Amino acid sequence: MKKILYKTNLGKYYLGNSEDLLRNKLNKDLKGKVQLIFTSPPFPLNQKKKYGNLKGNVYKEWFISLAEIYSELLTDNGSIVIELGNAWEPERPVQSLLPLESLLGFVNNPNAGLRLCQQFVCYNPARLPSPAQWVTVNRIRTTDSYTNVWWMSKTDYPKADNSKVLRPYSKSMKNLLKRQSYNAGKRPSQHHISEKSFLADHGGSIMPNVLEFESIDKTKEARIPENIFSISNSRSTDYFLQRCKEEGYNPHPARMQPELVSFFIEFLTEPGDLVLDPFAGSNTTGHCAEITKRKWVSIEMEKEYGMQSIFRFEDPSLRSLLKVGF
């Protein structure tokens, strides 16, 4: 029997091994119906974490095997987005190639039929200095402050619309639009810029694939798309952390940035589409999908993380019809 910990009108949170569930009991329900699989699998860390992580070739083989499971769940124009952190060789100040080898194996899995649509880099200044031995003790490496985010699909043209994730114009661009003139002509790059190339107001500028939800340059504001900012700036995260404290839970140590989840949900799906997270943890993905009126399915092995994820949906501001225990 499928173990549903809780559900809302839009989604369900399952407890169990995601590979087993998606190969068997959930396969029929989800096959060909998922528009976006967004997840952050356990990273190949050298120290064992409570939320689970494998090492070396065992990790790589396991990671590659996920591709064929996920691929058959997608709609014809669906997407897989995976956040994958960096790894280091044990007891050496040398970065491991394991994440890249795993990613290449995943994309090239002959039973999955995937291709890499685009690579993103997510800058996170809140990450602790790591690996600590080489960054803070010996001081021979710099802080690892980003993760790679890989967007894949079964088609060259998955559903996507970057006009839904435009970021606010910079002050200089706003001034240019107001002034309706700029220095046109030939550039050192040999590109010729016409007098009207940049005078149309499209409501914002196209996001780059380096995602700054906090600005790298502290003298400049982080220009987050307004619809993403409104989700990430809600009081829901504060509510979640407060409830964890009140109920004696230690919050999941590797919680997903809501801005990151929301960006890809807005970019790659529409209201009513189905979003899946096979490694849901405290269910940031399901929470962001709920806010944006997407259907969602989340799966997690650790009951403790499932229990604390309930707090996200008990937030009165969300107004979800939550049902717990089946």
Task: Enumerate the language-model features and the residues they cover.
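Conserved phosphoryl-transfer catalytic core
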Residues: 305, 314-326
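Core catalytic lobe of class I
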Residues: 2-308, 321
